[in-house]
A protein has these predicted regions:
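Mature catalytic core of soluble alpha/beta enzymes
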Residues: 1-186
Length: 186
């Protein structure tokens, strides 16, 4: 007997990050950072790097090199939210089935026959509040490349993004960002 359970708790960690930030700031906390399972992170000021902020590495969805990260950014007084197919998944007959279900297809992202295996494998949203960032990062993973680019550009004044698109036809990974202060790891 197989059992399956769906929940909509994808923004739960972001909501907790937002509420935790309020509590810490109300208590006078000005410095530091904290994360909730690495997918929701709050960066307050860094007293040792006041101008540049914290150095944050974004985990690589496929470990492109010896490094486990694919990008590094410097930031402070901001939230980051990440979604992707690389931590909660299984593979069956060469297809990856992850925990993010595309509401348009009913399949996990990248697994729908109509997608030809091309999809956003991970997305990080920087700015806004963490709950909205969690929702946006997950939504980006369910978009086509054109949709993700259009959405990111249309909302660039509200938040920044960093995402990786997997193109199955050419077996390439393409990183995109509208951030100014990030570096791609070689």
């Amino acid at each position: 007997v197989y059992t399956m359970q769906l929940n909509l708790s994808g923004i739960g960690k972001g909501f907790c990050a937002d509420e935790g930030t309020k509590i810490l700031q109300d208590a006078g906390q000005k410095y530091g950072y904290y994360n909730l399972g690495a997918s929701s992170m709050v960066l307050l000021s860094d007293p040792s790097h006041r101008d540049t902020g914290w150095s944050v590495s974004v985990t690589s969805p496929r470990y492109f090199s010896d490094s486990m990260s694919y990008a590094t950014l410097r930031a402070h007084d901001i939230v980051l939210s990440t979604s992707g197919d690389y931590e909660q998944y299984y593979e069956l007959e060469g297809t990856r089935y992850c925990h993010i279900v595309d509401p348009n297809t009913g399949y996990p992202i990248g697994a729908a026959p109509s997608q030809s295996g091309s999809y956003v494998v991970c997305a990080t949203v920087i700015g806004g509040n963490a709950a909205a960032g969690d929702a946006r990062a997950t939504a980006l993973c369910c978009m086509t490349l054109d949709e993700a680019l259009s959405y990111s550009r249309a909302h660039s004044s509200e938040f920044k993004v960093l995402f990786v698109w997997y193109e199955a036809l050419t077996n390439e990974y393409i990183a995109y960002s509208n951030l100014e202060n990030w570096t791609l790891e070689e």
